A protein has these predicted regions:
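Conserved hydrophobic/aromatic beta-strand scaffold that supports enzyme active sites
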Residues: 57-59, 105-107, 117
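Histidine-centered divalent metal-coordination motifs
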Residues: 32, 81, 121
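Cysteine-nucleophile active-site neighborhood
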Residues: 2-70, 76, 134
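Phosphate-binding/catalytic loops
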Residues: 112, 117-128
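Catalytic beta-strand/loop cores that center a nucleophilic Ser/Cys/Thr
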Residues: 66-113
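Acyltransferase
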Residues: 125-146
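Hydrophobic/aromatic beta-strand patches that form the interior of the parallel beta-sheet core
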Residues: 29, 47, 78, 97, ...
């Protein structure tokens, strides 16, 4: 898990180099800043969010695959961020797997690697099915032969 934190991906220490090195080898889940790092590593751009979302909830629709398997859609997610993925500069290597009802990118999945990112916080009490999402990610890691 590449965890959340303050600032931009460029300020995230070794997070981006870890994603570059290990995405082909092991499952990775990026949360908030970790999600933004995944997007930048694969050629996308992070920009200012349409509005600040610190301690707020949103409804989010998802594709019901991998980490979203067996989760309600739409679901409520807890958000704590002021930056988000740019749709205009989104990398071809990634697929958008979830968006808010107003169209903001909330989750991405790599097209080849077991690498996923979520802009929201699954660990937040405000995220309705965060525990199951994390369990789904752990299932991915348990199935993977390293």
């Amino acid at each position: 898990v590449v965890s959340p934190g303050p600032g931009r991906p460029i300020d995230a220490g070794i997070s981006m180099s870890i994603i570059e090195s290990f995405a082909p080898v092991i499952p990775i889940l990026g949360v908030c800043l970790g999600h933004q790092c995944i997007i930048e590593v694969f050629g996308g751009e992070i920009t200012y969010a349409k509005q600040l979302m610190h301690g707020k909830t949103s409804e989010m629709a998802h594709d019901e695959q991998t980490i979203f398997k067996d989760l309600e859609t739409p679901m409520i997610v807890g958000r704590y961020h002021s930056l988000s993925a740019s749709e205009d500069h989104f990398p071809e290597e990634l697929t958008v797997s979830a968006k808010t009802m107003s169209g903001e990118i909330m989750a991405v999945r790599h097209n080849v690697y077991d690498t996923e990112g979520v802009q929201f916080h699954p660990e937040s009490i405000m995220t309705s099915e965060g525990m199951q999402l994390m369990a789904n990610f752990l299932d991915t890691t348990n199935r993977r032969k390293v």
